[in-house]
Regions:
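Phosphate-coordinating loops and pocket residues in cytosolic domains that bind phosphorylated ligands
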Residues: 46, 197, 206
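GST-like fold's C-terminal all-alpha helical module
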Residues: 100-197
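Residue-level detector of short coil/turn "hinge" positions at structural boundaries
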Residues: 27, 34, 182, 202-203
């Protein structure tokens, strides 16, 4: 069985959980409490020297970086593909996914937020202001990209889930957690609303994880 080492609120781990659920794969969650720095323990660093989640264990091998893990799963289990068959369409989906995962998320991940608070002395209000600013900086262009794509489907690209949706939903979740106003992003809001009616997204949500009460 596939094992995913992660933290319930990690956006990167959340992405992988969504992919696993969309593909209806059997998987086991191995919680790693980032608040307690369990990712810095030698036993974890042996499998990921970066000390980051998620880590996927598959057939005795360990894989890191959420997008690499998801593409590995997509190739290993081609049913319910997360990337389109056309080369142009694949590039468009990857472009949007990378925009979220590589440009938006790194500015607001837990490591950054902890540094802002512990090292720079920002208050919770200032930290939220930081988060909201960078969400707006990312979601503005993303909303335009979605509108310009010409797709009116229920997902980022038409009527099928893709890597773009897998990346978008965790970012929206965390934006809402930090009280970000989504009223200016109706396309993003509609995708979020639809995805959260689906079992795969519900099962992958942070609140549904066994470590959701972790302190």
């Amino acid at each position: 069985m596939l094992k995913i080492y992660g933290f319930y609120r990690s956006s990167a781990a959340y992405r992988v959980r969504i992919a696993l659920e969309l593909k209806a794969l059997d998987w086991e969650s191995i919680p790693v409490n980032l608040r307690l720095d369990e990712q810095k323990q030698d036993s974890f660093l042996q499998n990921n020297p970066q000390g980051l989640v998620p880590v996927l264990e598959s057939d005795g091998k360990y894989f890191t970086q959420s997008l690499a893990i998801i593409e590995y799963l997509d190739e290993l289990h081609p049913e319910n593909p997360l990337l389109p068959s056309g080369i142009y369409e694949r590039a468009k989906v990857r472009g949007m996914a990378y925009q979220i995962a590589m440009e938006m998320h790194p500015l607001n991940n837990l490591r950054v937020l902890k540094y802002l608070k512990n090292e720079l002395g920002l208050s919770e209000e200032q930290k939220s202001t930081w988060y909201q600013h960078w969400i707006a900086e990312g979601f503005g262009p993303l909303e335009k990209t979605l509108k310009n794509s010409g797709s009116e489907g229920r997902f980022c690209f038409g009527e099928s889930t893709s890597l773009a949706d897998v990346c978008l939903i965790p970012q929206v979740y965390n934006g809402l957690r930090f009280n970000c106003d989504l009223s200016g992003y109706p396309r993003i809001q509609s995708i979020w609303d639809h995805c959260m009616t689906l079992d795969a997204f519900k099962n992958a949500a942070p609140e549904a994880q066994q470590d959701a009460s972790a302190k």
